[in-house]
């Protein structure tokens, strides 16, 4: 044994209780290299592209919206300090109302706290496993380090390989400066493994102490033991977390109790410390302690370069499906962040579903809602069916509890709780009892059935349909047949329900509820035919007889029987258009979209405008409302340098919801909806038993087009490139298949060329329609482009009493009229001006030659400013 090894081992001392739970190996001989730091690994690809590597250069800039590393099983928020635990004073919303923190989570792990959420199951959290403390003199670098002691700051999320890197200079009170670089990943190639690397370059010589530990402050709803084992509170799930440490290329040491090591360091030399973490529970292993220890050692044997390379390769495979928007770098960044969020919270082979915030936090207690089936699942299904499968496998896994739930409620078949956790038990897991959404949000049953049928359509897996899909389709159909009430006229009603609009409770014949119920009954009947099973006649009878509230004079579907036009919280009736594809007479889709889009609470959850965008694309009304809704689906909700998604525009989600609190983030529900605008909205993609349907559309604001690569259908892979005039569909692997188009079915054998719909080019007398528009200020969600998109349901509003809207008409010509259509509110005054060059302006006079027009509006109430639904301009 070398002298340096002897000195190192003899300096090790046991850690205090702060390192409880660590299964940790000692550091081999300390390695160092001359400064500067080693070159950045190239495994992450184009790590300077902002769309692939969002970056913060200001310490604390991302407070409340910290980045994360995740692999679908294991995930960790990474605080501004680069590793360890951090918390804020802000509280989460319903049902926890607890302080937010940068936590570590494991898929499917739940616990119970009698003093929290009425003692029902909520997500458990691990101790923070990324901690590698550095102590110099009497100071320790960590979450308590003052911002004034930190400089040269840079934190980057390498989306291409799921790596978070934080580099900075830490200066102690006595002036000693040390460069620190932390790198954190959750290995996608070996999902029970996480890894942390610290590179330390002191600009002084002396003594430094490095501590690898598990921080118990991060643990929630579990009891942690000194040997690294734990057990969740209330649910009794056993688990373990193990650590192995090494430096440089040395071999890892043997597992020992927690350690602290003190080293002599020299100025200008770089010292490398690596920590490999293994995590397992009784949910996935019969011997979680042994499995966790082996996962940790397995990673340590591979070393940092091996782990990083394998992880990056796994991420490269995941990124084979991508969306490219060359005209908009900002939109591109948002798209990549949205995809990363879903990928980091899903994995192949999982039987756990996706919570609204995935594995990024315990927002919404980590519960599973309809968010999974309706908002996150569809985009995954057409790009990563192997990941999407976890959503429906979770429902299959929890079907036993669903059957018990139905029986105890007095119904046949299966009944899934509005929110569920480990097993799907209505009474020990569902959180929403006042109002009683646990038993009235019945549309969830139809949402689950729809997802099951969509999985079959996307994969064509008849064996899965017979073994896993059919029991769910049959059980849910039986539920609806027993839930519906026969009326005297032979029709059927579903009473005492709450639809997706959570502002309406205890209603009769919710239109989406009844429509999705009928769809579930019909899909079950079709599955029975495919599998050779008898289908009860009552399934068809109830499906055909369910009342669908509709006003034929207005061509308007009513949200429920007796609906009076009140404000709604979120998308409800508009879901008939997509994803249900409910049959409608001409004009009904447009009437329904416009009516409900104008009545949706602007403070409602983030996903609503994504379905508005998809609906608008499907309708294709003259104008460019699709882009308005696309902007509304993402711009108001993006937060921080890493483009995390907030649940709401402001500080509260749903102004009329007494249970709402600080908005959830990273809100994967919103990200999933946003992605569907591209996968299903702009492409017009719909799944069929004998192929896919495509009907592409391109908003003018995305003039160079949109390309989707790596789309999947029944074992095939294909790309769609939507251009300004035509769309190219290219088969990249697999057998030919049918593409249904507006002109008829076509066989995709190599490439197909389809017409791209351009509703912005429809004939019009309005010279301002779909022209570039800007404003001096905008209320979030009420953007300038809305005033010229041709839709009466959208509008621009200034963010204050006064604002100016400017429209470029594209050519200088006489302007014969300018007509603003106002939103509600008290208008004080307005001014119209024109210009031929955008610099020199004069008051508008009929017939004046102009290329630009602008409108300045002043309102009496700065809190409720008047806006513009449409600014119409006439030119010969």
What are these regions (language model features)?
Residues 19, 652, 755-812, 821-830, ...:
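Disordered, acidic Ser/Thr/Pro-rich linker "stalks" and the adjacent N-terminal cap
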Residues 36-365, 746-748, 756-760:
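Acidic/polar, glycine-enriched structural segments that form the non-catalytic walls/loops
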Residues 368-399, 450, 457-458, 467, ...:
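Active-site core of glycosidic bond-cleaving carbohydrate-active enzymes
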Residues 114-179, 433, 489, 623-774:
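Non-catalytic C-terminal accessory modules of carbohydrate-active enzymes
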Residues 346-360, 386-450, 456, 463-467, ...:
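Helix-terminus loop motifs that line ligand-binding clefts
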Residues 855-863:
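Short beta-strand-plus-loop segments that form exposed binding edges in beta-rich domains
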Residues 1-36:
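Secretory targeting and sorting signals
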Residues 475, 479-531:
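Acidic/histidine-rich catalytic neighborhood
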């Amino acid at each position: 044994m070398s002298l340096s090894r002897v000195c190192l081992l003899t300096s090790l001392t046991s850690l205090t209780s702060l390192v409880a739970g660590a299964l940790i190996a000692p550091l081999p001989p300390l390695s160092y290299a001359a400064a500067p730091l080693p070159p950045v690994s190239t495994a992450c690809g184009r790590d300077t592209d902002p769309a692939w590597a969002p970056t913060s250069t200001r310490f604390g800039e991302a407070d409340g919206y910290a980045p994360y590393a995740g692999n679908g099983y294991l995930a960790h928020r990474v605080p501004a300090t680069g590793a360890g635990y951090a918390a804020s004073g802000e509280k989460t919303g319903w049902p926890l109302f607890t302080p937010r923190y940068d936590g570590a989570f494991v898929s499917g792990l739940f616990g119970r706290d009698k003093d929290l959420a009425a003692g029902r199951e909520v997500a458990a959290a691990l101790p923070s496993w990324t901690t590698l403390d550095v102590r110099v003199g009497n100071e320790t670098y960590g979450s308590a380090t003052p911002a004034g002691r930190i400089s040269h700051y840079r934190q980057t999320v390498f989306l291409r390989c799921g790596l978070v890197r934080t580099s900075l200079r830490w200066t102690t009170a006595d002036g000693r400066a040390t460069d620190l670089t932390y790198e954190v990943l959750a290995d996608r190639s070996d999902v029970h493994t996480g890894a942390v690397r610290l590179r330390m370059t002191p600009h002084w010589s002396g003594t430094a102490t490095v501590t690898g530990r598990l921080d118990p402050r991060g643990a929630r709803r579990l009891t942690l033991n000194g040997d690294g084992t734990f057990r969740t509170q209330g649910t009794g799930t056993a688990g373990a977390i193990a650590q192995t440490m090494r430096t440089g290329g040395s071999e890892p040491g043997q597992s020992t109790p927690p350690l602290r090591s003190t080293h002599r360091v020299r100025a200008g030399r770089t010292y490398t410390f690596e920590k490999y973490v293994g995590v397992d529970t009784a949910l996935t292993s019969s011997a979680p302690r042994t499995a966790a220890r082996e996962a940790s050692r397995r990673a340590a044997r591979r070393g940092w370069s091996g782990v990083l390379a394998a992880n990056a390769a796994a991420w490269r495979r995941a990124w084979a499906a991508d969306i490219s928007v060359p005209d908009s770098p900002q939109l591109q960044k948002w798209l990549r962040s949205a995809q990363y969020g879903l990928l980091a919270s899903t994995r192949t082979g999982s039987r756990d579903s996706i919570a609204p915030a995935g594995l990024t936090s315990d927002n919404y207690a980590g519960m599973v809602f309809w968010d999974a089936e309706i908002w996150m699942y569809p985009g995954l299904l057409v790009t990563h069916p192997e990941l999407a499968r976890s959503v429906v496998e979770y429902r299959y896994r929890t079907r036993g509890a669903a059957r018990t739930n139905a029986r105890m409620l007095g119904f046949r078949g299966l009944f899934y709780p509005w929110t569920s956790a480990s097993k799907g038990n209505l009474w020990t897991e569902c959180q929403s009892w006042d109002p009683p959404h646990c038993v009235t949000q019945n549309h969830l049953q139809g949402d689950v059935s729809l997802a099951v049928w969509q999985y079959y359509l996307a994969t064509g897996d008849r064996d899965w349909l017979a073994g896993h899909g059919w029991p769910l389709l049959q059980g849910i159909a039986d539920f609806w047949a027993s839930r519906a009430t026969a009326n005297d006229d032979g029709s059927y009603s579903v009473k005492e329900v709450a639809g997706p609009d959570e502002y309406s409770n205890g209603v009769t014949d919710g239109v989406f509820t009844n429509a999705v119920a009928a769809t579930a009954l019909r899909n079950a009947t079709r599955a029975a035919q495919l599998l050779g099973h008898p289908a009860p006649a009552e399934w068809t009878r109830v499906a055909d007889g369910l009342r669908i509230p509709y006003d034929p004079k207005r061509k308007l579907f009513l949200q429920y029987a007796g609906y009076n036009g009140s404000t709604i919280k979120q998308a409800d009736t508009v879901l008939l258009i997509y994803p249900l594809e409910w049959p409608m007479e001409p004009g009904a889709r447009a009437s329904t979209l416009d009516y409900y889009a104008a009545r949706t609470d602007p403070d409602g959850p983030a996903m609503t405008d994504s379905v508005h965008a998809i609906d608008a694309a499907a309708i294709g009304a003259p104008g460019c409302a699709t882009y308005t809704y696309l902007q509304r689906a993402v711009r108001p909700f993006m937060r921080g340098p890493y483009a995390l998604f907030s649940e709401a525009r402001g500080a509260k989600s749903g102004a009329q919801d007494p249970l709402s609190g600080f908005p959830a983030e990273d809100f994967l529900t919103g990200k999933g909806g946003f992605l569907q605008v591209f996968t299903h909205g702009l492409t017009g993609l719909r799944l069929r038993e004998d192929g896919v349907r495509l009907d592409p559309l391109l908003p003018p604001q995305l003039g160079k087009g949109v390309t989707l690569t790596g789309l999947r259908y029944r074992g095939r892979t294909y790309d769609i490139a939507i251009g300004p005039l035509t769309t190219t569909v290219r088969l990249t692997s697999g057998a030919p298949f049918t593409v249904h188009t507006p002109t008829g079915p076509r066989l995709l054998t190599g490439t197909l060329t389809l017409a791209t719909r351009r509703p912005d080019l429809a004939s019009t007398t309005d010279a301002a329609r779909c022209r570039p528009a800007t404003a001096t200020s905008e209320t979030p969600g009420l953007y300038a482009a809305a005033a010229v998109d041709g839709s009466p349901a959208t509008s621009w509003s200034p963010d204050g009493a006064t604002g100016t809207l400017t429209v470029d008409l594209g050519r200088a010509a006489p302007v014969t009229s300018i007509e603003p259509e106002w939103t509600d509110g008290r208008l004080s005054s307005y001014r119209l001006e024109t210009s031929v060059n955008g610099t020199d302006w004069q008051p508008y006079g009929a017939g004046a030659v102009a290329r630009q027009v602008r409108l300045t509006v002043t309102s009496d109430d700065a809190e409720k400013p008047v806006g513009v639904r449409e600014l119409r301009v006439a030119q010969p």
